[in-house]
């Protein structure tokens, strides 16, 4: 049980996410950029390795190896936590006035999307998580690089400091827009490709429970409108 709590803390999953917004906002932006991708990538790699090792030691022919993990309905529990993580991250992100806090809650929401494929533990779900992590790394680091540049030039990190960015610095404004659209998951960006692989793995599993979770999940609104 403690291992699962540690995993949740590592990837900023609800209800172990409370440290994320304050750490993101209080740390230097360069450090925040590192924290936004490195722990999450390491956390998901560790989770996949952990459960894969457990399942490889299960007796052959076991219909549902998850049942042997503390006799708890882990697929359903992880799916519920995934839905809670997606919902809270997306809804709270659009209420922030600080770009760094917005990206913090965006990071929480993205963890929820990747958690959606964890209970499946199929080849396609693992590939989907790895693909999503790779796309997320480039999208998130790009957004933070823009924040670092604006901080150096203007001296602020709030949304007010980004007002009129398209007129003042067209190239920077276009770059930030592209990264935000990608984080939202709109086609034809890399964010859409990452979410496509995750959703495809869920649909391929054919479980009514996970398909219901997929269709009722909130829209990925990771940028403030």
PLM ranges: what are they?
Residues 1-5, 215-220:
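Conserved small/polar residues in nucleotide/adenosyl-binding loops
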Residues 3-4, 33, 92-158:
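Alpha-helical multi-pass transmembrane bundles of energy-transducing inner-membrane proteins
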Residues 3-4, 15, 19-37, 104-106, ...:
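Interfacial and helix-entry/exit segments of alpha-helical transmembrane bundles
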Residues 7-77, 104:
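Short helix-boundary/re-entrant hairpin motifs in multi-pass inner-membrane proteins
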Residues 42-53, 115-123, 180-188:
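Hydrophobic alpha-helical transmembrane segments in multi-pass integral membrane proteins
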Residues 52-60, 116-129, 203-209:
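Helix-coil boundary and interhelical linker segments in multi-pass alpha-helical membrane proteins
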């Amino acid at each position: 049980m403690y291992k699962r709590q540690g995993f949740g803390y590592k990837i900023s999953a609800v209800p172990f996410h409370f440290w994320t917004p304050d750490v993101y906002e209080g740390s230097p932006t360069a450090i925040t950029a590192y924290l936004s991708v490195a722990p999450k990538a390491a956390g998901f790699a560790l989770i996949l390795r952990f459960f894969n090792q457990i399942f490889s030691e299960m007796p052959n022919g076991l219909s549902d190896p998850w049942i042997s993990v503390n006799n708890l309905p882990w697929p359903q529990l992880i799916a519920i936590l995934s839905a809670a993580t997606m919902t809270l991250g997306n809804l709270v992100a659009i209420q922030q006035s600080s770009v760094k806090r917005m990206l913090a809650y965006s990071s929480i929401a993205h963890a929820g999307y990747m958690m959606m494929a964890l209970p499946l533990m199929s080849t396609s779900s693992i590939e989907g998580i790895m693909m999503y992590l790779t796309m997320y790394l480039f999208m998130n680091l790009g957004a933070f690089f823009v924040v670092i540049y604006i901080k150096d030039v203007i001296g602020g990190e709030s949304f007010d400091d980004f007002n009129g960015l398209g007129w003042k610095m067209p190239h920077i404004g276009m770059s930030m827009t592209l990264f935000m659209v990608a984080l939202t998951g709109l086609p034809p960006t890399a964010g859409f490709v990452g979410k496509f692989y995750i959703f495809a793995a869920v649909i391929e599993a054919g479980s009514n429970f996970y398909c219901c979770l997929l269709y009722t999940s909130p829209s990925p609104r990771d940028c403030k409108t």
